[in-house]
Amino acid sequence: MGYTIKQKIGICLKAEANPEMTQSDLALWAMKEYNSERPPSQTTISRILNSKNDIISRKESEFELIRRRKRANPLLRRILTEWITQANWEGIPITTPIIQSTANAIWTRLPKEGQEGNGIFNQKWCSHFVKKLNINITGSPRDVLDNRGYNLNKVWKLDEILELKRYLRDIIDQEDYAPQDVFVIDDFQLFYSLPLDQIFDVSSIDKGIKQSNSSAEHSLTIMLGCNIDGSEKLTPIIVGKYDKFDVSKSTHVSLNSMQFDSVSYQTLMNKLTEVYNIFYKSNTNKWITSSMFQNYLTRLDHKLSNSRPNGRKILIILDDCSSHRIINLKFNNIRLCYLKNEANHKNPYNTTYSGIKFDYLPMNFGIVEEFKILYRLQQYLEMINLQRSKSQIDSDPMIEENLTSTSVATTATALEVLSESDYHISLIRAIEWITRSWHSVSSERIFSSWKKTHLFNLLDWPSGNSGQLVYLNQKLNTFDENKSLKKLKEVMSYLNVVIPWEIDELVGLVNERGKVTLSYASIEEIIDSCLSEPVDDYDEMGDDDGRFDNRKNELGDVSSVPVDNSNDPWFTVSEINEFHNDPFYNNDKSIDAAAEPLESISPDNDSSAIPGLETKALSAISGLGTTSTSVVSDSPSGTTQKYNNISTYPNGSLKHKLGVLENWNRKRGPGQGQGQGQELQNPQGQQQQEQQQQQQHQMSGYNFSPISNIESPIASGGLTNPNVQFGNGAGSFDNQTPLFMNSLTSPPPPPPVPVPVPVPVPSVPSQVPATSFPQDVSSSRAVRAPMSTAAVDVDMATAITKLLEYSASNTLKLSQSTIDDLDYNLRVIRARLNQR
């Protein structure tokens, strides 16, 4: 017998709730559950599970279908559905002649391969099409009554805050929502392959100018969601430009061995969802369309029905951008609350657009910013290690001439400035970083963001059950909100660049803050957003007989796949020790000791996202000390510095101009350069660290079990299975160091250091007693004598002259503003040299 869509959904949900069941077990369960004469074949079960993401998102109107007929013009139907959805939300009247005219206009704009028929659509076709859409935006009278007298598509404006707070309190009390049942959803752009050196053309991203095709290719739209206490995070949606892409650089063995061009789109997407617990979609504009969002919520609604005996009901707060305007707001287990986004600009690319969002979405009060900081931190660590691997350890003769016998004999290492192509990040690597960053956002950060909205009285929850919120509120007393920002700022100083980013600009890029889907979308925009998106032609496979095997119900038993860490950038300390055979990486030294002072800022913050990534940053910084004591870059902007104030920069707003020489040279004085790190001996801590590393190596996949928020309902009704490895947020990475050693060649041994003559500034001892701890990260670095002023000027003038020569010969592409800045700096330096 054939199975209906509803029965197939039941099979998929049963498989996800019981991952230990084999396909033969599922077949026997289906026969008993649905009173079949015989169990379905192995081929049938396999096909159902292979299309489970598509099947679970089916609407109720399709529940009784067994086979769905292949329909004509699937692309036109998708575009017309998007247009009708937007028109209904905007209150535009829709009649049959208007639908006929719009359908014909869409048909003429489609590429030839997407056109079917003659482009003429009669009244019967239009009537049947609208009926199948099942439009329900405002809700029935009963739905309005249950919604406290408001339409389902009610959008709450900024000046309705008091009425909104009363509505939320009444709804929570009426439906008995716990804090864990209230979620927020928001989407934003991420330029995942952004060059970290502003000498390259990044003005279109930084200043809000409309991007060119080359820069727009390396951006993604990401949708994130979480509840109030941060205990559950919804599965992210990631939308890119390409439906299939190279996955050979994945750190997961089942992906890096896959030939993406030889597998089907469905197989690749299922594997990405299985490994990273994300939904990847694609279209030309990289938009989350309303159809995507409708399917996402429908899938979530079906899983909520299966999470508890009587289902679980949740409330989702979101803004009213066009992506969230769906055609049917009636769900069995989900209630949507729309907030007006006052930053409703038709053209967010306008240079005067500030990107400030006047709303009450918790995502805009620190969650998205924290996510981007954690992503950029991983990007900087990757580039620092790439730069280190490409740089040659050569001494500058001019520096050697100015070094006296009282100076530290270790010369500076000139780190090679990376090219624009070096900053390219593969899409699969970006997905891994996105997943890691989202899982590393702590519950304290999430709760703090909800608290800042003042939408709820979190300590006096209407339906009770506020014990966890009281606990989180107490932990906020020791929670350092700027900890991740400080760490990113410190790590940024170790990347040698020509024109560095300012941290506020990097985290708050205009085109990342602005939504391109805020207002009503035109037909042309809708067509672009639907092109290249895989089209569902509603063609179901039939039942085939076949023999059973005892394969798992997913694409494969991931837990049994061997782990291949050869391409994993997050190597453990012991592996780096073995690779380098360097005194710095001695096994009897603990790399975590340097992080102790920073971690002591928040001793009770066990689930903070920063300790783990912070330790990796410190490890990377200390690792640089093995080959470098201070960086004399090719330009003064690239000189590594450490600033104690987040908002203070050496040159203020004139970041492209040289600061006062005395101030600039003082920052490069003793104790300010990169020095060889001194570590503490802690054999007991090292032994515990190695044991934890062995446990991590036994894990499968990308060194974590993705938080299966909506994937595996559990008996308690939660959307998330307990995840031991991510129990401490990013602290789970404490015993790993993020040095990318895959393409690194072993560095030559450091030059012998003669016994230095005592100098006024004492140097760091080579061995620190185990009972003493450094008070600051910079205290673990060696001391370097300052360079003479003349030597610095000559070095800078030579470097700037070379840059201008490269630009004149088109070897290096520089913007005109950068060339003007370099000319200005060169004139200042030459004038200063002529005065001596």
From Swiss-Prot:
Boundaries of every HTH CENPB-type domain copy: 64-139
Top-rank taxon, per record: Eukaryota
Protein's UniProt keywords contain DNA-binding: yes
Record flagged with keyword DNA-binding: yes
Signal peptide: none
InterPro entries: CenT-Element_Derived, DDE_SF_endonuclease_dom, Homeodomain-like_sf, HTH_CenpB_DNA-bd_dom
Low complexity: bias regions: 626-640, 677-698
Keywords of this entry: DNA-binding
Ranges for region Disordered: 626-732
Record-linked PROSITE patterns: HTH_CENPB
Listed Polar residues bias regions: 641-651, 699-711
Coiled coil: none
Purpose: Essential for the synthesis of pyruvate decarboxylase.
Protein name, UniProt field: Protein PDC2
Organism name: Candida albicans
